[in-house]
Regions:
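Non-catalytic alpha-helical scaffolds and adjoining flexible linkers that form interface surfaces
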Residues: 1-23, 28-217
């Protein structure tokens, strides 16, 4: 009896070559969190998996489940994020977002809001209406909140008024409306300080892509 494929929607976080023609993928999915999948023959010149097995691709994946990983049977891309490649330094921030999504991602736990947040953050980098650094801080703070690592303070004491409003907006707004504000230089400094402080208290990992961004400043 033929196994039924699992239908999962998500974003490709990592893709690395395996053997002569295959690719190993890490995908953050709405339904089952972070998974590992193998795309057989994905590196062959005429493979239907060539384009859909790259980082940033948002797609619907049909996968056969094994003991420790999945095997890709079919994929239908909704967004290849091709515009991001020409955005500098936006693409570097994009890779950082993928790293952070992988850090927080857990296998077997639904991650619909995390997938939606990642997709919205990547699209915000492409639109370019917010600075990549502000997009980063919004993404970081909302990620902390989703994962139960940030509680909104009772007041914004010591914080710029606009920054305090931005913090509340980041925590409470629908993902579709998150990346829709700008701040003055002073307010952004205050907002960044709050997010950075909360982030350092929780996350103890060094992110390679973030180190590259810091070197470019």
């Amino acid at each position: 009896m033929m196994r039924e494929a699992a239908e999962l929607t998500g974003v490709v976080l990592y893709a690395q070559p395996v053997g002569e023609y295959d690719r190993r993928l890490v995908i953050l999915t709405r339904e089952r969190g972070k998974i590992t999948a193998f795309a057989r023959g994905a590196r062959r010149p005429k493979s239907p998996f060539i384009a859909v097995t790259n980082p940033f691709v948002f797609a619907r994946f049909s996968l056969y489940e094994g003991r420790d990983s999945y095997t890709l049977a079919h994929a239908e891309a909704a967004d290849y994020m091709t515009e991001l490649a020409s955005k500098m330094p936006g693409v570097l921030y994009g890779y950082y977002f993928l790293e952070l999504a992988s850090y927080f991602g857990r296998e077997g736990l639904e991650a619909a809001e995390s997938v939606n947040l990642l997709y919205a953050a990547l699209r915000a980098l492409i639109r370019g209406q917010m600075s990549p650094e502000l997009v980063r801080r919004v993404y970081e703070l909302r990620s902390l909140m989703i994962n139960g690592e940030y509680a909104l303070p009772e007041s914004g004491a010591g914080m710029d008024g606009c920054a305090w409003y931005a913090v509340r907006h980041t925590v409470a707004s629908p993902v579709s409306k998150l990346f829709s504000f700008t701040l003055s230089e002073e307010a952004e400094r205050s907002y960044t300080a709050e997010v950075s402080s909360a982030f350092r208290r929780t996350v103890d990992k060094t992110f390679k892509s973030l180190a590259v961004i810091d070197k470019m400043r």
